[in-house]
């Protein structure tokens, strides 16, 4: 019976095939992997066989040493790498341990500093409360003793907080004894400390003598420092370092004997050579030994070269074998295997290198951290040391204050001074224990504490402190009050040395002074800070006010002279009663020079403009009239700034200040009036140039009115001097005579100008002859004015000063004469230039008229022709 295969049977067959395939695929992969492993093993077997054949061929016994040497070098290299890694790991571990220990120590030191700061602040507050009590009865008797005992207890607590941990147990007994002695207050603290400090020194000396086996005793007076003792016997070096750590109370000393690494003891090696032959045989042996010693390095070098050649040959043979095997076993099939091996090796090397770099970076970071922590530890240890020293000194001071030798000194002013010294030591301690970033926060507290201490101290110290702590606002108010004061003061008050330098909107002043009416060193300095060379000037030394003013005048431009000339300076070598007068005349001389320069500059600008604009005289004069007030305003501002100098005079110069003020006003008014007269004349000439005689007559009629006003001002000047008291009698007469001569000179100048104008108004028909006559007559007229000017010094020199204080007035007169002479010269120069221009213009007009006449003569003749 035959059964035909149906669809169900075919489907089952397909499912079976798929299942079989799925089962056989892992087996196929496994077989492939086994085949690759077999290939690798075969390859290695062939390589081993090749090496064995080569070794047999090249006599393996000869190459055995070379193979061992190569293997030994490779092993040594691996061991060195491993040792280096272990060394780095150990060093890293040590640094980690060191960092953690330093962190713990830093935390402890910071905590100790914080506790010390709190204790020092509480002690400072306690001392401040003790120094400035609310009820004065509590500062005497038993209450004072109890409060001082509390202060000593706080100071001891502070010393305990600042002491290291290893000294706390050692200081407990000493502190208990000190507490008992403080309460009993039987003996001074200094004597007790001297007795306590002798005992550990003697024990230390005995210990040092026992340890070092020294033959002589040490000097007990010398301080104990780090002692280093070295014994040398038969080339044996042993070192002991005796480290003395003194306790913070100065009463206990500890000895730490630390071993210092050095060479171990070893017996002396003695080599004896017994000669058995004559001397010649010994010499021959010595020569042979020397030759052998010389040839040994050469032999070793040759052996090394031979080994290197063998290695190169062996490597070449292995490379040749690998190339043949790759060709034999189809290099393409083994290519993936070789690449994977090389890739794994490279990856392994990169991982090793990355790990080494990571360890090196971590080690570097730890080193940096260790160094920074070492620096911080050094700073904190130094701060703790300074704090301990300050706390000890404060403790000793309080102990001495609590147990005085003389009971009378513990009351009254001496007690206050001692308490103030204790407060100062406490403040110094707080400052030492405060970190650098907390210094700014503690400044306000220190200032308040200093004010409290100074209030309770002597009046002299309080006055000095107030003068040092005056702010800039109060300084400016003081300067304004001094400069604006006009009321009379007592002239019998002693004159102090005063150095004041004013600068507009550029002065940032600092007041330094001391209240002393007898010493010459009590002075008020107002020092400018706006210059960039202040530090260099301070290094060079103090600069005199005169030199300072001259340097400022050189640097300041022309427009800022009004600031520089308002400076009041006083030489330090003059007397106090004479300084105020000399400073006043010094500034007055500078104002006169400034005014003369301004007038000369104004005249010179006027002459230049007339030269440039000779073709349009009316237009040029109108422009000049418009521009003149600006130029004159500058000079007038400088002139009117002169009286501000007189406000800085001292009390004894108060009567003269008003007189100089009036005189300066009259002189400025006269100068302004003369400028107005000249401008008025120029305007009249411009308005009507065709009729000069009529305009000049009108001007002559109007001039007396204007001049009368100026003369009234001038003659009203001496009235200001009549108000001077009897103290200024000699100065009043001198100034009065000077004013009369000054007015006479002004009248002479006006009369000369009038005569010149009258001669010009006559208008002679021949201009050439008139010019020659003018040149002849003019020197006589000017000679008259010069005679008047030259007579003034004779009159002034005849007035001898009645007292030394009249010398400044004589200087002022001479400067006034110099100013007048300069003014007259400038006027003559301007007038001569103006007349020359007028002559040139007249010549040009005459030539034009002649040309017109010639043209008119030729014109009728040509018409007739």
Swiss-Prot record:
Pfam families reported in the protein's UniProt record: Olduvai
Primary site of residence: cytoplasm
GO cellular component: cytoplasm
Residue spans of biased composition, Basic and acidic residues class: 190-200, 833-850
Coiled coil: 70-130, 339-401
Keywords, sorted A to Z: Coiled coil, Cytoplasm, Repeat
Summary of the tissues where the protein is detected: Expressed in spinal cord.
Olduvai domain mapped to chain residues: 165-259, 436-528, 529-617, 620-675, 676-767, 770-865
Family annotation (InterPro entries): NBPF, Olduvai_dom
Residue ranges of the region described as Disordered: 161-200, 450-475, 520-567, 829-865
Compositional bias of kind Acidic residues: 165-181, 530-539, 550-562
UniProt-annotated location(s): Cytoplasm
Extra facts: Encoded by one of the numerous copies of NBPF genes clustered in the p36, p12 and q21 region of the chromosome 1.
Family classification: Belongs to the NBPF family.
Name used for this protein in its record: NBPF family member NBPF11
Species of provenance: Homo sapiens
Annotated gene: NBPF11
């Amino acid at each position: 019976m035959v059964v035909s295969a149906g669809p169900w049977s075919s489907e089952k067959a397909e499912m079976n095939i798929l299942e079989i395939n799925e089962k056989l695929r892992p087996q196929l992969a496994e077989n492939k992997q086994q085949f690759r492993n077999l290939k690798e093993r075969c390859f290695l077997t062939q390589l081993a066989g090749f090496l064995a054949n080569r070794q047999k061929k090249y006599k393996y016994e000869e190459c055995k040493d070379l193979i061992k040497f190569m293997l030994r070098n490779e092993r040594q290299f691996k061991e060195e790498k491993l040792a280096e890694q272990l060394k780095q790991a150990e060093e890293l571990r040590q640094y980690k341990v060191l960092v953690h220990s330093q962190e713990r120590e830093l935390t402890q030191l910071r905590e100790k500093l914080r506790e010390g700061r709190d204790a020092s602040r509480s002690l400072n507050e306690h001392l401040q409360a003790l120094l400035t009590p609310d009820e004065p009865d509590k500062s005497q008797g038993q209450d004072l003793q109890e409060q001082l005992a509390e202060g000593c207890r706080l100071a001891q607590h502070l010393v305990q907080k600042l002491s290291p941990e290893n000294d706390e147990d050692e200081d407990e007994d000493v502190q208990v004894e000190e507490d008992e002695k403080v309460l009993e207050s039987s003996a001074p603290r200094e004597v007790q400390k001297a007795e306590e400090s002798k005992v550990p020194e003697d024990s230390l000396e005995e210990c040092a003598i026992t340890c070092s086996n020294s033959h002589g005793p040490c000097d007990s007076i010398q301080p104990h420092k780090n002692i280093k003792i070295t014994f040398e016997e038969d080339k044996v070096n042993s070192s002991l370092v005796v480290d003395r750590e003194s306790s913070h109370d100065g009463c206990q000393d500890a000895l730490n004997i630390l071993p210092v690494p050095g060479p171990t003891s070893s017996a002396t090696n003695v080599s004896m050579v017994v000669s058995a032959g004559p001397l010649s045989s010994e010499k021959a042996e010595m020569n042979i030994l020397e030759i052998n010693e010389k040839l040994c390095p050469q032999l070793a070098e040759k052996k090394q070269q031979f080994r290197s050649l063998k290695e190169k040959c062996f490597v070449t043979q292995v490379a040749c074998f690998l190339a043949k095997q790759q060709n034999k076993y189809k290099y393409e099939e083994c290519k993936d295997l070789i690449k994977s091996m090389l890739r794994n090796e490279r990856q392994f090397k990169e991982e090793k290198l990355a790990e080494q770099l990571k360890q090196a970076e971590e080690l570097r970071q730890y080193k940096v951290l260790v160094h920074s922590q070492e620096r911080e530890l050094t700073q904190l240890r130094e701060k703790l040391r300074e704090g301990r020293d300050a706390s000890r000194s404060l403790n000793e001071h309080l102990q001495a204050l609590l147990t005085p030798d003389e009971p009378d000194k513990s009351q009254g002013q001496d007690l206050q001074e001692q308490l103030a010294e204790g407060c100062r030591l406490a403040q110094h301690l707080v400052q030492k224990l405060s970190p650098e970033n907390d210094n700014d926060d503690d400044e306000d507290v220190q200032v308040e504490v200093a004010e409290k201490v100074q209030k309770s101290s002597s009046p002299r110290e309080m006055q000095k402190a107030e003068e040092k702590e005056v702010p800039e606002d109060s300084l400016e108010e003081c300067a304004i009050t001094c400069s604006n004061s006009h009321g009379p003061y007592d002239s019998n008050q002693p004159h102090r040395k005063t150095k004041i330098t004013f600068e507009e909107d550029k002065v940032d002043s600092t007041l330094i002074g001391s209240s002393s009416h007898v010493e010459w060193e009590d002075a008020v300095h107002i020092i400018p800070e706006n210059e960039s060379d202040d530090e260099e000037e301070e290094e060079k030394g103090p600069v005199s006010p005169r030199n300072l003013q001259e340097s400022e005048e050189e640097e300041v431009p022309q427009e800022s002279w009004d600031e520089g000339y308002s400076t009041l300076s006083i030489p330090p070598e003059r007397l106090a009663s004479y300084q105020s007068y000399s400073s006043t005349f010094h500034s007055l001389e500078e104002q006169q020079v400034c005014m003369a320069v301004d007038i000369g500059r104004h005249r010179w600008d006027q002459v230049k403009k007339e030269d440039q604009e000779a073709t349009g005289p009316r237009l040029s004069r109108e422009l000049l009239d418009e521009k003149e007030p600006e130029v004159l305003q500058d000079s007038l501002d400088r002139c009117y700034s002169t009286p501000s100098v007189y406000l800085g005079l001292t009390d004894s110069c108060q009567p003269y200040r008003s007189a100089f003020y009036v005189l300066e006003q009259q002189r400025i008014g006269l100068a302004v009036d003369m400028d107005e007269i000249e401008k008025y004349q120029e305007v009249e000439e411009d308005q009507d140039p065709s009729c000069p005689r009529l305009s000049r007559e009108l001007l002559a009629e109007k001039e007396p009115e204007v001049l009368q006003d100026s003369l009234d001002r001038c003659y009203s000047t001496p009235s200001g001097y009549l108000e001077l008291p009897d103290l200024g009698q000699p100065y009043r007469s001198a100034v009065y005579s000077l004013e009369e001569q000054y007015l006479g000179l002004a009248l002479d100048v006006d009369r000369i100008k009038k005569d010149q104008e009258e001669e010009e108004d006559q208008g002679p028909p021949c201009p050439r002859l008139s010019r020659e006559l003018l040149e002849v007559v003019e020197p006589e007229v000017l000679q008259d004015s010069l005679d008047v000017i030259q007579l003034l010094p004779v009159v002034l020199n005849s007035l001898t000063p009645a007292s030394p204080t009249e010398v400044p007035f004589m200087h002022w007169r001479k400067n006034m004469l110099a100013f007048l002479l300069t003014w007259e010269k400038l006027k003559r120069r301007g007038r001569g230039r103006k007349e020359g221009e007028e002559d040139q213009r007249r010549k040009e007009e005459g030539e034009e008229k002649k040309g017109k006449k010639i043209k008119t003569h030729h014109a009728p003749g040509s018409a007739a022709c």
